[in-house]
Amino acid sequence: MLSNKRGIHSASGGIDLRTLREYCLFEDFDVCMPFNPMGVPGGKGNRGSDGAIRGMLPLGDAMGDLFTAGKAGSTKMEDKERFDPYEDNSGTTICLKQGDFIVVAGDTRHSSSMVINSREMSKIFQVGDFLLTGTGFYADTHEVYVKMVYEIRQYEVDDSINIHSAANLLSKILYSKRFFPYYSFCVLSGFEKGKPYVYSYDPIGSFGSVTCVCSGSGRSMIQPLLDSFIDKKNWNNAEETQLSQEDCIRLVVKAFNSAAERDVKTKDNLEVCVMRENQVMRETFPLRRD
């Protein structure tokens, strides 16, 4: 038999490997596995014609396990390094309409993961005669706002735009990015002939007219409250009464104070806009800043 650096060659051309480390297949394999071609202690025995095949079976199983473990590890690494273009800057917004006015409110915290980026970032944008709010990825919301302003200015070269046309325009802007959607939950508010309208959207442009809506990280806590006090969805034989402007503001402030106690992304300040036809009044209230 001829000596070889990697193993020992037999006359039949086969190779008897002593250990996996000796063959240098797996440098990070910490446990040395002695190779026993016949399964006999010491590796001695009569080699038959299928001795090499029978001897490789245990090694093949070991290699298979190692390859399987390697694939599982690589899959986990791929999951960690997967491309994710979105970030949840979140916060909370509320829009509700009553009689001849609309209340639009939102907190001013801009956060990402465990970092506070800003304590004075408004989530309420004025687009012509309308108010636009958005939660989710702030950069996407701002891009939607910029596109809305641009398209409305082009439209109003000939004639002024009404709330219904603006609502359809916003839907088209969101739907145009349906294959790589804006991560933004928008609400558009405005008036048409003295009547208030609030339109709520999902990220791909589906929308509908609502009486009250809450979006963002505090939605699960605030929306049931609005459904009860504004829409009276869980009341029996409730009369359809309109709340006054002061009662609506008081309700919104209490709702945000409660959400700020439990939601880390809804903090710092509360910006409240009371919108009437051709008039917008703004007011700021303090929230928890921790």
From Swiss-Prot:
Signal peptide stretch: none
Compartment list: Cytoplasm; Nucleus
Cysteines joined through disulfide linkages: none
One Pfam family it belongs to: Proteasome
One cellular component term from this protein's GO annotations in UniProt: proteasome core complex, beta-subunit complex
A GO biological-process term: proteolysis involved in protein catabolic process
Main subcellular localisation: cytoplasm
Record's keyword terms, sorted: Cytoplasm, Nucleus, Proteasome
Organism superkingdom: Eukaryota
Record-linked PANTHER family: METALLOPROTEASE TLDD, PROTEASOME SUBUNIT BETA TYPE-1
Family membership: Belongs to the peptidase T1B family.
Function as written in the Swiss-Prot or TrEMBL entry: Non-catalytic component of the proteasome which degrades poly-ubiquitinated proteins in the cytoplasm and in the nucleus. It is essential for the regulated turnover of proteins and for the removal of misfolded proteins. The proteasome is a multicatalytic proteinase complex that is characterized by its ability to cleave peptides with Arg, Phe, Tyr, Leu, and Glu adjacent to the leaving group at neutral or slightly basic pH. It has an ATP-dependent proteolytic activity.
Quaternary structure and interacting proteins, as annotated: The 26S proteasome consists of a 20S proteasome core and two 19S regulatory subunits. The 20S proteasome core is composed of 28 subunits that are arranged in four stacked rings, resulting in a barrel-shaped structure. The two end rings are each formed by seven alpha subunits, and the two central rings are each formed by seven beta subunits. The catalytic chamber with the active sites is on the inside of the barrel.
Name under which the protein is recorded: Probable proteasome subunit beta type-6
